Amino acid sequence: MAKKKLNKNWLHDHINDPYVKLAQKEGYRARAVYKLKEIDESEKLIKPGQIIVDLGCTPGSWSQYVRNKLSGSVGGGINGIIIGLDMLEMEPIADVHYIQGDFREQNVLEQLEVVLAGRKVDLVLSDMAPNLSGIAVADAARMMDIIELAIDFAQHHMKPSGSLLVKCFNGSGFNDIVEKFRHEFKTVTQKKPKASRDKSSEIFLLGKTLKNPL
């Protein structure tokens, strides 16, 4: 009974969420786009001519936003390269190179390298998150694993001067994640965009300029 009530409350909040309504109005696939938009507007992350990778890109709202930022016009091509990676299937987005699969696997990396053609990435975005169990220690370990995957990807594929933006949760293990970022990046900033729900412990970490590029 409690679970049913919880689901009803979530549905009510979701339907009445101003960011959900705005996403529907502006043609974005998820409200998460406004988290990236706010961070981008304050940090000036996305610029014409960049190569940008969106890790865990499904359903695609972040890639949609990046595409719009690099285009300046609808349907007119883009000034830059966008690559979306995810194990889940995603509906195509114009001008976005989508690669389905686990980016730890060789065949996926080979597809990535074909698109990159020897070039390095300017910006890596990651909205990836684990399925939370409610067990703090286990969830913290899963989150750290995902953060480390994103950092490792950035070290191998990003320009030394590039930036990595990741989602994490401000709870058990968060300080360890921040320390990991400080060890790997010259500048680390914590971001809590307005589009993050008040009840959520979600927070974003932005690392700029790699200390240990590979």
UniProtKB/Swiss-Prot annotation:
Q: Which domain of life is it from?
A: Bacteria
The record's annotation in Pfam families points to: FtsJ
Cite the entry's keywords alphabetically.
Cytoplasm, Methyltransferase, rRNA processing, S-adenosyl-L-methionine, Transferase
Q: What is its EC number?
A: 2.1.1.166
Which reactions is this enzyme annotated as catalysing?
Answer: uridine(2552) in 23S rRNA + S-adenosyl-L-methionine = 2'-O-methyluridine(2552) in 23S rRNA + S-adenosyl-L-homocysteine + H(+)
Q: Which residues bind S-adenosyl-L-methionine?
A: G60, W62, D86, D102, D127
GO CC terms on record? Answer: cytoplasm
Q: Name one GO molecular function term.
A: rRNA (uridine-2'-O-)-methyltransferase activity
Gene3D superfamilies xref list = Vaccinia Virus protein VP39 (3.40.50.150)
Give the matching InterPro entries.
Answer: RNA_methyltr_RlmE, RNA_MeTrfase_FtsJ_dom, rRNA-MeTfrase_E, SAM-dependent_MTases_sf
Catalytic residues in the record = K167 (proton acceptor)
* Protein localization: Cytoplasm
For this chain, the family text in UniProt reads: Belongs to the class I-like SAM-binding methyltransferase superfamily. RNA methyltransferase RlmE family.
Stated role:
Specifically methylates the uridine in position 2552 of 23S rRNA at the 2'-O position of the ribose in the fully assembled 50S ribosomal subunit.
Q: What is this protein called?
A: Ribosomal RNA large subunit methyltransferase E
